[in-house]
Amino acid sequence: MKLTTRSRYGTRMLLDIAMHGSEQPVSIKDIAQRQGISVKYLEKLIRVLRKAGYITSTLGAHGGYQLAHKAEDIPVGDVVYALEEMEAPVECDEENPCCPRMAVCLTRTIWGEAAKAMYRKLNTFTLADLMRDASLCPKNACNISPHATH
């Protein structure tokens, strides 16, 4: 299954907020600069993540974004699920009967199971786990290029 940039960039943005926003809110411009993602695209992701309850915002000169929960309480799979517009790798599965061949389709059930397995595996990791992984990087090895795509 190929995840969209919404999942990859949204997870990176949450991780950035987790790593830099523990004491004060993080500005969207700072996130954009560190992650090499446009402010405009991050604004779209912020709306989704705020609605899902993962981040809070503070207005004003020193405003920005912070996690709404502790990093260890935010499972990566739940974040990806909130960011992706499609739950399964195909439009039809056993829970979404949209295909006219549904009654005779022999592969329908595996697509839903594949998605469930992916989210279950992703949920074995939290933002805190990813932060610990980042702390293992040698100094400067984890610096993100302005042209980073993953």
From Swiss-Prot:
One of its GO terms (cellular component) is cytosol. Pfam families: Rrf2. InterPro entries: TR_Rrf2-type_CS, Tscrpt_reg_Rrf2, WH-like_DNA-bd_sf, WH_DNA-bd_sf. Residues 2-132 form the HTH rrf2-type domain. Keywords: DNA-binding. NCBIfam families: rrf2_super. This is Protein rrf2. It comes from Nitratidesulfovibrio vulgaris (strain ATCC 29579 / DSM 644 / CCUG 34227 / NCIMB 8303 / VKM B-1760 / Hildenborough) (Desulfovibrio vulgaris).
